[in-house]
Amino acid sequence: MSFLKKSLLLILFLGLVSLSICEEQKREIEEDENENEEERNEASEMKRYAFGYPSGEEKKIKRETEEDENENEEERNEASEMKRYAFGYPSGEEKKIKRETEEDENENEEERNEASEMKRYAFGYPSGEEKKIKRETEEDENENEEERNEGSEMKRYAFGYPSGGAKRMKRKPVEEEENHVAGSKMKRYIFHLMDGEVKKI
């Protein structure tokens, strides 16, 4: 983190140095242009005297006004730069670095996603979409099962079909009746044998 901070400060410092150099070159170019302008003005002044054009004093006043405006613009730019340092507003270079960092993070995220996708294909791990489809399929099956159960319950109420509990209750008395009949048969058989023995004696 400290290395990144130092790198950012170094880049920012180099950017400011480059900016100051550019401003110095711009000022020199403007001075050269002003000198050329003065030379042209002198030539024009001679024409003005000859043809009655406005004097060079008026152009000088206009040029000084433009120079004052340029100086005010530079002062505003310097004040804005000081505000960025004071309040932590990012400069153009910092914004560029931040944007490049975000782009690198997005690329790394895409690479991780591609690597995960390759692992899924290689080892058969279900992707997020497949898990979602499987979960939705299971939910649909559960809903269909519940609907079938509700439909069966409605049929039982409508047509008098016994439910599982009712079938079990109905089957129990039948079993008791069968046991009772079997017991009666055994009793009759025993007493019949005894009656035959008595008659034989």
Curated annotation (Swiss-Prot):
Residues that bear D-allo-isoleucine: I190
Protein name, UniProt field: Dermorphin peptides
Free-text tissue specificity from the UniProt record: Expressed by the skin glands.
Lineage of origin: Eukaryota, Metazoa, Chordata, Craniata, Vertebrata
A single MF term (Gene Ontology): opioid peptide activity
Localization per Swiss-Prot or TrEMBL: Secreted
Biased composition (Acidic residues): 30-40, 66-76, 102-112, 138-148
Keyword Ribosomal protein: no
Purpose: Dermorphin has a very potent opiate-like activity. It has high affinity and selectivity for mu-type opioid receptors. Deltorphin has a very potent opiate-like activity. It has high affinity and selectivity for delta-type opioid receptors.
Region of interest called Disordered, as start-end residue ranges on this chain: 26-181
Signal peptide: 1-22
Swiss-Prot/TrEMBL keywords: Amidation, Amphibian defense peptide, Cleavage on pair of basic residues, D-amino acid, Endorphin, Opioid peptide, Repeat, Secreted, Signal
Chief location category: secreted
Amino acid composition bias (Basic and acidic residues), ranges on this chain: 56-65, 92-101, 128-137
Residues that bear D-alanine (Ala): A50, A86, A122, A158
The family this protein is said to belong to: Belongs to the frog skin active peptide (FSAP) family. Dermorphin subfamily.
A GO CC annotation given for this chain: extracellular region
Domain of life: Eukaryota
BP GO terms, sorted: defense response; neuropeptide signaling pathway
Any Pfam family: FSAP_sig_propep
Ligase keyword on record: no
Propeptide, chain numbering: 23-46, 57-82, 93-118, 129-154, 165-186, 196-201
Residues with Serine amide modification: S55, S91, S127, S163
